[in-house]
Structure formats: structure tokens, C-alpha cells
Amino acid sequence: MNYSSKKTSGRISMVVKQYEVGNFAVFCYLIGDEETQEGLFIDPADDAKGLLSEAKSHGLNKIKYIVNTHSHVDHIMGNAEMVKKTGAKIIIHEEDAAALVRTPPYLLEMFGATASPPADIQVKEGEIIQVGNVKLKVLHTPGHSPGGMSLHLDGMVFTGDTLFVGSVGRTDFPGSSWDVLENSIRKKLYVLPGETVVFPGHNYGSSPTSTIQYEKRHNPFVRG
């Protein structure tokens, strides 16, 4: 676990936890409302048993959603097991929904992965994903994939493979685009307040989190 926070705002007692899971340095996030005991996972790529144990230790006994920031296999390979254990509904951006269930068999074999069930809910820009009284706003941030999305929550943004600490997502995959990715970062992420904490989709940087202000000043790929 790299980041741990509990925040009380009004009636909301919010849990935010960061975990590095699997063999590909994927960051998974547990977010929930202690009062209602509802939670969700962002990109639970591996170790469903361990993640659920963590959720219960923080009083989150009902995992309502699995939110995928995009459809690439390293982020969705834990979906099937998590759905089996929790009955949680899968959420993904509408432009990545088809790709979620079309992972090539050779990639599944290469990653030792099980195919994901289809999405239960498809979202788009500006929609709200809610667990208890905790609300995450969908930011469509394509470029790494057509339906890549980030999630904005109370001074935090979960950026998937759009923006990393000191780096950005690859754009050499089918459906990727450097111009689109750069536009997403500039128009959707760099417009957020500078103190907004960046929670990336992989542990690729010098630290597990960053801020919008830091990335605008120091990210060598996209300067603000």
C-alpha cells in the first residue's frame, strides 16, 4: 500500500487507498464511504482476495462497482474474479466498452488473464459514479485508448494511463493517438487546481503520487 487517507467532510467519512497489484506495477484504488459501508475498486487488476480483505478492514463490506479507467488487459484482468466474489457491476467509458470483451486470446495467455465480463454500465464525460455519499466525476481523457477516462474527486484525480508521475501513457497501440492524449492532459487535467493530487494507473514514477502543479512544471512530455 502506497497511499492511505481518511477524510471527513460533513457527513461523509471517505476512504481512499492505493495498492500496487500484480506483475505489471498497476495501481488499484479502493474508494468508499465508511458510513454506508459501500465502496468501489478502480482497476483491480489482481489479488481480489487480498483487496477484499483490505476493504473489509476499512469497514467497506459492499463493493458496488469495478471501475476500469480503460480496456487494456493489464487493468481489466482481475475483473472476472472480483465480479465472482462480489457481484459488483463493471463500469467503463462507452468508447472502450466493446474493447473490454475483445482482448485477443494471445494477450490473455501472455498475461495469464481471464477474459473480462462485459460492462454493466457505460459512462461518458461529466457523469457521476457514486458510492454512498462519495461522488466521482468522469473525465473523458482519450489518447492512450479511445475510451480512457480519469475520475475527479475532492482534490484528487485518478488518471489511469493518461498521466503518470513524470510521464504519460503510451500512444503506439491501436486506437491510441499522441495528439489526442496531449489534448486530454492539457484540456481535462491541467485545468484542475494545481494542488489536485494525481493518482496514476501505474507505479512508474519517482513517487506513487504527484500534483497537477508539479506535472505542469516538470513532466517532460507535456508542460503546462
Predicted regions and their residues:
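Structured loop/turn residues at beta-strand edges in well-structured enzyme cores
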Residues: 12, 58-61, 132-134, 194
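Conserved S/T- and glycine-rich ATP-binding loop of Class I adenylate-forming
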Residues: 31, 69, 141
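Short, glycine/acidic-enriched loop or turn micro-motifs at the edges of active sites
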Residues: 35-36, 46, 73, 96, ...
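Active-site HxH/HxHxD metal-binding segment of metal-dependent hydrolases
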Residues: 39, 46-131, 217-221
